[in-house]
Swiss-Prot record:
It holds the Pfam family PCSK9_C3. This is Proprotein convertase subtilisin/kexin type 9. Residues 448-690 are annotated as: C-terminal domain. The keyword Lipid metabolism applies. Transmembrane segments: none annotated. Residues 29-150 form a propeptide. It is an enzyme of class 3 (hydrolase). It comes from the Eukaryota. The active site is at residues 184, 224, 384. Keywords: Apoptosis, Autocatalytic cleavage, Calcium, Cholesterol metabolism, Cytoplasm, Disulfide bond, Endoplasmic reticulum, Endosome, Glycoprotein, Golgi apparatus, Hydrolase, Lipid metabolism, Lysosome, Phosphoprotein, Protease, Secreted, Serine protease, Signal, Steroid metabolism, Sterol metabolism, Sulfation, Zymogen.
Length: 690
């Protein structure tokens, strides 16, 4: 795979030291800075006093980028288990160095992580991977890989709500209470657009540029970062004109960086946050590389510390879940649209899409600061520009409500977006139902959102077609899982259920025999002071429907689901509501376990809406009225031809097979049933604040 295999040298350590001290030994090293010599000298005491670990099989796992040209063999991030002590990374690194030296290998320790995640970055032969994976405390090892900048004035008008548009862009505030960290190339901080608004930190961690003839012209090295800084907070073309920026250089003059450099940059931010806590922080990640477990884990750690991370979805016209940091659930991932609200096309490529994208934003022909001169402007395109727009909007939202959590901010961004404006035909057919049809916009005002019950739909990864395959969707830690549904393109599924896992509730969907796979779909809501539970009824006797309702007084029904434990063809009727009989009851097939999701929260009230047509339809929908939020979606009555039910914003969608091939009769027509809820408590509290 492009890696040079090192020769095994079984020389005594003193002889190895003499060779390293000589000129020939120095020339043989990959680095010429003398660090290897100091390393081996330091290992004498380690080798004398440290017994080698028993040769057990490796329990840790190894990960590398799926795209071979992006890989960096020879550099590895070693991640330790979470419960390890703060001093453990250094101790484990020394142990690895000592054991490698006994085998005739040298390891260069490049960085030790403490504040972001426990681990270290090393340069070593791939021959040592098996040894490293067997070390105690090691959770996994990831090979380093490249990340890339994602760039290839209608934009300001587009993010302003229509009812507030005027002749010029007039944001509700400038985002002055928020600090935005930009991980990018270097920045021309003297440009008139961003002068006095950007602090260029001393952080720099970039790989060498490709090619010996590449000239590091300032205008090339600064171009990407300068443009994005102008989009976020530029005087004339910026979104959040009052936000302050701090730049970290993690991309070289060609717009290329590494996963390890990005990790070190994120740790730099975390260290600053610990040393000098400030107000809300937004981190803009206008870059993308192959899927990286360690980079996603680092984003998760930073998000838990209260930092909002906004990332480019990527410009590869591909599933964003295949790239990092776009695939990290804790990151707000942004795709790119043009002035007509259509997905951006960049030659043969274009914006990424799929379930890992949260929303889209302007990303084509965006005017911003140019590094060619201090008064120059340039037009650029890509998901980097789209992410910069959302970072600016987030800065303004956080300035208006500094106490917003990541979950609350994400829900507001989704709620206030322009909906159903993107032509879904641009996306691959299998991605259309997974990709959000949302274009970012500012909220209509800085107040008045507190009364709203916010919910979003979270899709799982595809389960795969194996016989007993399952899919799992989960909400963010600050969100409540109010309902669970499933979807299968073949229609063969064994239903879904809510299950407790690791102290949290998750939505599980089950594939059926002969099925092509299934998706789990979670409805995740912000419901303060909620007390939620799931009540289950086992399968009823033959010919009898299974019924279940909320047992506790004051609890209301927010969703229904059911599943079959025994193997079948997935043709049983799914759980359904009978709103005309008992609106707080779920009813399912006699062979299925039926589950009622019930919640109690101050002022929470829910109702059921049903919509059906007398003739079979491939899709039936029912929507909640304004002021009500969809929490549950199911089919009524449900037949073998139902593919599944899912929520799109506040609309319940029930999909069936193509009626031209199924031979449906009018008696088999499917109706959509929505559970719509609102919180009178939140509305009252909002009115009192006003």
């Amino acid at each position: 795979m492009g890696t040079v295999r090192s020769r095994r040298l079984w020389w005594p350590l003193p002889l190895l030291l003499l060779l390293l001290r000589g000129p020939a030994g120095a020339r043989a090293q990959e680095d010429d800075d003398g660090d290897y010599e100091e390393l081996v000298l330091a290992l004498r005491s380690e080798e004398d006093g440290l017994a080698e670990a028993p040769q057990h099989g490796a329990t840790a796992t190894f990960h590398r980028c799926a795209k071979d040209p992006w890989r960096l063999p020879g550099t590895y991030v070693v991640v330790l288990k979470e419960e390890t002590q703060r001093s453990q990374p250094e101790r484990t690194a020394r142990r690895l160095q000592a054991q490698a030296a006994r085998r005739g290998y040298l390891i260069k320790l490049l960085h030790v992580f403490h504040d972001l995640l426990p681990g270290f970055l090393v340069k070593m032969s791939r021959d040592l991977l098996e040894l490293a994976l067997r070390l105690p405390h090691v959770d996994y090892i990831e090979e380093d890989s490249y990340v890339f900048a994602q760039s290839i004035p209608w934009n300001l008008e587009r993010i302003t709500p229509a009812r507030y548009r005027a002749d010029e862009y007039q944001p509700p505030n400038g985002g002055s209470l928020v600090e935005v960290y930009l991980l990018d190339t270097s920045i021309q901080s003297g440009h008139r657009e961003i002068e006095g608004r950007v602090m260029v930190t001393d952080f720099e961690s970039v790989p060498e540029e490709d090619g010996t003839r590449f000239h590091r012209q300032a205008s090339k090295c600064d171009s990407h970062g300068t443009h994005l800084a102008g989009v976020v907070s530029g005087r004339d073309a910026g979104v959040a004109k009052g936000a302050s920026l701090r730049s970290l250089r993690v991309l070289n003059c060609q717009g290329k960086g590494t996963v390890s450099s990005t990790l070190i940059g994120l740790e730099f931010i975390r260290k600053n946050q610990l040393v000098q806590p400030v107000g809300p922080l937004v981190v803009l990640l206008p870059l993308a590389g192959g899927y990286s477990r360690v980079l996603n884990a680092a984003c998760q750690r930073l998000a838990k510390a209260g930092v909002v991370l906004v990332a480019a979805a990527g410009n590869f016209r591909d599933d964003a879940c295949l790239y990092s940091p776009a695939s990290a659930p804790e990151v707000i991932t942004v795709g790119a649209t043009n002035a007509q609200d259509q997905p951006v096309t960049l030659g043969t490529l274009g914006t990424n899409f799929g379930r890992c994208v949260d929303l889209f934003a302007p990303g084509e022909d965006i005017i911003g600061a140019s590094s060619d001169c201090s008064t120059c402007f340039v037009s650029r395109s890509g998901t980097s520009q789209a992410a910069a727009h959302v970072a600016g909007i987030a800065a303004m939202m956080l300035s208006a409500e500094p106490e917003l959590t990541l979950a609350e901010l994400r829900q507001r961004l989704i709620h206030f977006s322009a909906k159903d404006v993107i032509n879904e035909a641009w996306f691959p057919e299998d991605q259309r139902v997974l990709t959000p049809n949302l274009v970012a916009a500012l909220p209509p005002s800085t107040h008045g959102a507190g009364w709203q019950l916010f919910c979003r739909t979270v899709w799982s990864a595809h389960s795969g077609p194996t016989r007993m395959a399952t899919a799992m969707a989960r909400c963010a830690p600050d969100e409540e899982l109010l309902s669970c549904s499933s979807f299968s393109r073949s229609g063969k599924r064994r239903g879904e259920r809510i299950k407790a896992q690791g102290g949290r509730r998750v939505c599980l969907a089950h594939n059926a025999f002969g099925g092509e796979g299934v998706y789990a779909i979670a409805r995740c809501c912000l419901l303060p002071q909620a007390n939620c539970s799931v009540h289950t009824a086992p399968p009823a006797g033959a010919g009898m429907g299974t019924r279940v309702h909320c047992h506790h007084q004051g609890h209301v029904l927010t969703g229904c689901s059911s599943h079959w434990e025994v193997e079948d063809l997935g043709t049983h009727k799914p759980s359904v509501l009978r709103p005309r009989v008992q609106p707080d009851q779920c009813m399912g097939h006699s062979g299925a376990s039926t589950h009622a999701s019930c919640c109690h929260a101050p002022g929470l009230e829910c109702k059921v809406k049903e919509h059906g047509l007398p003739a079979p339809q491939e899709q039936v929908t029912v929507a909640c009225e304004e002021g009500w939020t969809l929490t549950g979606c199911s089919a009524l009555p449900g037949t073998s031809h139902v593919l599944g039910a899912y929520a799109v914003d506040d609309t319940c969608v029930v999909r069936s097979r193509d009626v031209s091939t199924t031979g449906n009769t009018s008696e088999q027509a499917v109706a959509a049933v929505a559970i719509c809820c609102r919180s009178r408590h939140l509305a009252q509290a909002s009115q009192e604040l006003q």
